[in-house]
């Protein structure tokens, strides 16, 4: 939908790719796995440049599967909990770290951000718990596509969106991050307007 003819993780912000930004946020995470599909050679080249020890997981069926399948592929052979996130996000580092600091073993947790994305998944809340998702009638917060989840959640999946799959596990705890998805041209423009927030440093 962005229409740049390349993966959104390779979009450049002042000499820093979105993928490089995400890898900088994960610098203290020892086991990082990146699921690749569209233009995988270019994505792998950038990944090797910025995080050479990351594990590459191929999704050759990316044209006929959903992000949910990529999550399941990335979670294979893991046990316990895992941080799942999309690779088209720009995130204020301090808020991301605060979310990580609040994650606990065995406790599913969703990262929410103030609603701003053109095609958002809005969170329905009861206190700090996410009780539902919807695409219409905006709420104050949208799901940021960042989650701390047990890998067993992805042992049995269908052909659906991630948020639809996660509905069966609600309610879930939540934490707030400041993040910008770059799914559309409007989203990209909004992220560029806020680029100063992300601590981007070219490498």
Residue ranges of predicted features:
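Conserved core of the sugar-phosphate nucleotidyltransferase
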Residues: 92-166, 171-175
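N-terminal glycine-rich phosphate-binding loop and ensuing alpha1 helix
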Residues: 1-43
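Short, aromatic/basic amphipathic alpha-helical patches
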Residues: 44-50, 194
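Terminal amphipathic alpha-helical/low-complexity segments used for targeting or macromolecular assembly
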Residues: 151-154, 163-203
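Conserved beta-strand segments of alpha/beta enzyme cores
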Residues: 9, 31, 53-55, 171
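Conserved beta-loop-beta/alpha segment of the NTase-like Rossmann-fold superfamily
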Residues: 51-125
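Short aromatic/basic micro-patch
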Residues: 12, 90, 148, 181-182
